[in-house]
Amino acid sequence: MSGLAKFAGLAVGVLSLALSLGCAPAAAQSRPWLDSTLLAAAKAEGSLVVYSSTNEQEGLPLFKLFTDVTGIKVDYVRASDAILMSRMSIEFRADQKSYDIAQTSTINKMPLQMLAAYEPPEASNISADARDSNKRWYGVYANYNAPAYNTEKVKAAELPRSYEDFAQHKEWAGKVAIDGTDNEWLKAILQHYGEQKGVELVRNIVAVLKPVVTDGHLAMARATGAGEYWISLNNYVNLSMNVRLAGNPIGVWALDPVTLFFGQVGVSAKAPHPNAARLAANFMLSQECQQFLAKFGRLPTRKDVQSTPPGIVDMLTQKTVITVLMSPDEERKWQRQFDQLFKGR
């Protein structure tokens, strides 16, 4: 079976958003991202294909907003970061023009030739560290990492003030979780503490708390909010906030270091609808888009968009923030070390 054929059985939902052809961009004056010349060229192309790892509960209504404003039909293909990375690589080698924009947290790991160099006008409004110097990707939301806790199981006064303090809580053994892919967090820990001290710190935490290694950050956040786990040793703050906004008893607190990477958008070098791709990339960096995503707990990369609830970014940035953007080789190295420390292999 060829590499391309293997994807025939993948459960990658291709979800076509409703087309609102009668929707005129009369509101362009209030939408700086909606360039009239680019819009006309994009509408002539007919549609937009999005590859995204964002869950459908957020992604579908977000791109329905794009469709309602522009009249451009969107095919939304949702899968995990790993599946999308593999799929895009195979399609690129096969010279397929299959998607227009990618929206995942791993675009910075893609070879430069797979992405078009493009600087959306709205990029000037996002933080400097969320802009790729090669103009291949831009941060749509900030993926801050911090521990989380079930507010009915653990009192705020009991929370550790440093990662060293975790080993003092033997009563939490077996009630602490961490996702099995948190290699970015591990790299930040060792960078902050130094390799020897950092490894000793993690080994102490594992020995005392015996963390449950989970599969899926959102599932872990939901399990923490439900009380299955009392503590998430680390998780994406936006997902913990998503569960909190749904009415569950979960909170976050910040420790040194706070790991940061980004949910990113990039334009395919082989986009079948290049003008629609550029318009959509600009939309993803707009105030309108980031305000929409903030309703789900996503943390904005724009200074003019407030987090939900307010003050989360300010709390996190009072600590030492370490931005982690790794190549595929670096990620494999840190994942091996993570597996050795947390899984004993």
Show which residues each predicted segment covers.
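Extracytoplasmic ligand-binding site segments that recognize negatively charged/polar headgroups
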Residues: 49-64, 75-228
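A bilobed periplasmic-binding-protein/Venus flytrap-type ligand-binding module shared by bacterial periplasmic
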Residues: 146-153, 190-192, 262-273, 292-295
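A ligand-binding cleft/hinge motif common to bilobed small-molecule-binding domains
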Residues: 106-112, 230-249
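Extracellular/periplasmic bilobal clamshell ligand-binding domains
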Residues: 308-345
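Bacterial N-terminal signal peptides
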Residues: 9-22
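Periplasmic-binding protein-like
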Residues: 128, 143, 171-181, 202-206, 211-214, 284-307, ...
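Extracytoplasmic "Venus flytrap"
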Residues: 30-35, 43-61, 263
